[in-house]
């Protein structure tokens, strides 16, 4: 699982080190890289495993092939996705297109989201985090704890 938030910087060759815990999780899943695509929810980069992007692709494929919303999702996610392999030191090279979308110049945050993670420009993420915490507080009753735990686990 991808947890926590880490800050790393681009090196002189435009590479960035993916946090060790994120690489370890991906390695445990049998992957030596990540899939990245520009978020259409905010100015960040979405990152996930090959398995996750295959699930997203299946969800898109389940839509009527003649409806334009299928094309919207396929274009916004699949056509924009890039498979990035880790080098020997756990680094990736994000494309200039991805960096521009997220407004990243040098520093970036790797933000764990459970089954996925996001890559943000630090100031943009701090602003988003304030809004996210407020909205999470307002919507906290929407988390249905009982659906996910049996036999009084997690109480």
Report residues per predicted region:
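Flexible "stalk/tail and boundary" regions
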Residues: 1-7, 12-15, 21-84, 88-89, ...
């Amino acid at each position: 699982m991808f947890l926590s938030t880490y800050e790393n910087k681009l090196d002189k060759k435009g590479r960035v080190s993916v946090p060790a815990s994120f690489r370890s999780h991906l390695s445990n899943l049998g992957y030596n890289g990540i899939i990245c695509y520009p978020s259409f929810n905010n100015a960040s980069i979405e990152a996930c495993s090959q398995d996750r992007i295959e699930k997203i692709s299946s969800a898109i494929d389940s839509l009527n092939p003649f409806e334009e919303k299928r094309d919207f999702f396929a274009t916004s996610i699949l056509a924009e996705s890039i498979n990035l392999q880790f080098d020997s030191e756990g680094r990736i090279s994000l494309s200039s297109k991805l960096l521009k979308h997220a407004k990243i110049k040098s520093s970036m945050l790797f933000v764990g989201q459970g089954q996925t993670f996001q890559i943000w420009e630090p100031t943009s993420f701090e602003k988003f985090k304030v809004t996210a915490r407020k909205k999470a507080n307002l919507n906290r009753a929407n988390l249905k704890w009982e659906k996910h735990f049996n036999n009084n686990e997690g109480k």
